[in-house]
Amino acid sequence: MPELAVRTEFDYSSEIYKDAYSRINAIVIEGEQEAYSNYLQMAELLPEDKEELTRLAKMENRHKKGFQACGNNLQVNPDMPYAQEFFAGLHGNFQHAFSEGKVVTCLLIQALIIEAFAIAAYNIYIPVADDFARKITEGVVKDEYTHLNYGEEWLKANFATAKEELEQANKENLPLVWKMLNQVQGDAKVLGMEKEALVEDFMISYGEALSNIGFSTREIMRMSSYGLAGV
């Protein structure tokens, strides 16, 4: 991950900062809401893991409340319609997969892609966050690694039967991540978050997850290439 110095020149009360923050804050709130709903739906597909998935969902709901408090602390109203549109692609793909009972695709979208995206965003945000948001985000990111681990472990245990669907789901959903990164880069930069750092941190987390599941380095490079044209 590119080394980031803590920057102190931010005026967290400026209109420029608060305008960008209204969208970034909304994105993280909506991301946690998506995660909450997704884990509850996955509990329907994996009744044997219902207790664990419900626990993960409750954690995501707590995260959402924490990020709502971050917005309140800066007196910013999150632009939730913007955030809902931001997640529309992944949301639609998850709901389609859920309706067809495709648990592998659901796990890839939520437990790998969305979690790795969140980890990247939070890691890059922490050094440049205001003091209140930094404390909240540091606590959240620790939880997200455990959520990523849940998806890894389930998919690793079922790798032989899940591999083909994982490759197809990656092909369909990874390009959406690059579209999302491109869409958010202007606002992220105002907050001190560089797109290149977000991309690198995401690929580290996502690539490590794919490796832990059972994909070879060559396979991971091929799977990662589906998004490179959009970076």
Swiss-Prot record:
Residues that bind Fe cation 2, according to the entry?
60, 115, 147
Name of this chain's protein: Aldehyde decarbonylase
Question: What Gene Ontology molecular-function terms does this entry list?
Answer: aldehyde oxygenase (deformylating) activity; transition metal ion binding
**SUPFAM superfamilies linked to this entry:** Ferritin-like
Question: What does this protein do, in the record's words?
Answer: Catalyzes the decarbonylation of fatty aldehydes to alkanes. Requires the presence of ferredoxin, ferredoxin reductase and NADPH for in vitro decarbonylase activity. Involved in the biosynthesis of alkanes, mainly heptadecane and pentadecane.
Q: Which family does it belong to?
A: Belongs to the aldehyde decarbonylase family.
Organism (species): Synechocystis sp. (strain ATCC 27184 / PCC 6803 / Kazusa)
> Which residues are connected by disulfide bridges in this protein?
none
Which reactions appear under catalytic activity for this entry? a long-chain fatty aldehyde + 2 NADPH + O2 + H(+) = a long-chain alkane + formate + 2 NADP(+) + H2O
